[in-house]
Amino acid sequence: MNSLFTRDVTDENNLAQKLAVLAKTKQGKACGSCDEPVQLSPNHAYIYVVGFITAQFPSLSLEKAFEQSSSLTESQLGKVNDEVGLQRLNRNKQLPALLLQGLSSANNRNIAREMHWILDNVEGNETYTLVPSSHEKLTQLIAALSLTTKQEKVILVGSRLESGVIEVSHLIPANLKALTDVASLLKSGNKEFTELVDEILSMNANDGNTDNDRALNFVLYHNAEVYLKSYDFCYKSTPGGPNPSGYQLVNVRVRTSLSGERWVAKVIFDYQGINTGAKQSWYSAVDVTGEYPFLLVKWQRFLSHT
């Protein structure tokens, strides 16, 4: 099964239109269905990305302060006496577990605030530097280290301060209740379903910094229908039907457009019949206007028109 992620309409193509709406929102014009003004951000200021939370010591002096104030021994941290040793420690795969143990203490909050917080993407590459906006957000970062130690991902919601630097608004464990049905089928040992879920989820390997990527990531972790319906198409075909061998998921694309004063992204899944080559498409729609995306349409037939 071949999956392909394409962007039919980029946010840049809509920039002039987007800025025009933004000008209205700055004047406090409210949307028709809410009490607060619509908030749109130019230049893709919002982030909705999946990855792992890690942290590093920015200086040797902070590492020594951590060593002295925590119950960890020098042997646990490794002998760090110079910048080379510090770099070695920062690359240590066991560091998140050690930091979780030490930074969980309220006495070490001042050290936690000085740490260099990082989001690694799902492929393990350093993607963003993170800035907690409050004591609560710092607590979330520390707690997220426990997920990293178990190789469990988080969803980061935030806004860009500058290139590569993100202010943290919220951290959400990626094992969401919305995927409970999916998880139960995975536990059943269904190899075909497991492979399908892994393939679709692999599309979360993006930076989550465009409306298209934010919508895609939201759907992947908040809409179980994507997996359940795709499995039906691919593996629950009707023997007497036109495609007894089922369908293949051949393409996933995102179309973002302005609907009134709201930005709506349609995440479209294209299926092709193995026997006939006939195609059909289904979509999930997400409102990506504000910092927190939300689902508008769970699963509906997509009919393309020109």
Where are these regions (language model features)?
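Long, positively charged binding patches that form subdomain-scale interaction surfaces
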Residues: 173-278
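Hydrophobic, Leu/Ile/Phe/Ala-enriched alpha-helical segments that form helix-helix packing faces
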Residues: 142-145, 219, 223, 286
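Short, well-ordered strand-loop elements centered on a beta-strand within folded domains, enriched
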Residues: 166-171, 248-251, 262-268, 291-303
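Extended, non-transmembrane interaction/recognition domains
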Residues: 2-201
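Generic recognition of cysteine residues
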Residues: 31-34, 234, 283
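A short, surface-exposed beta-strand/turn
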Residues: 272-301
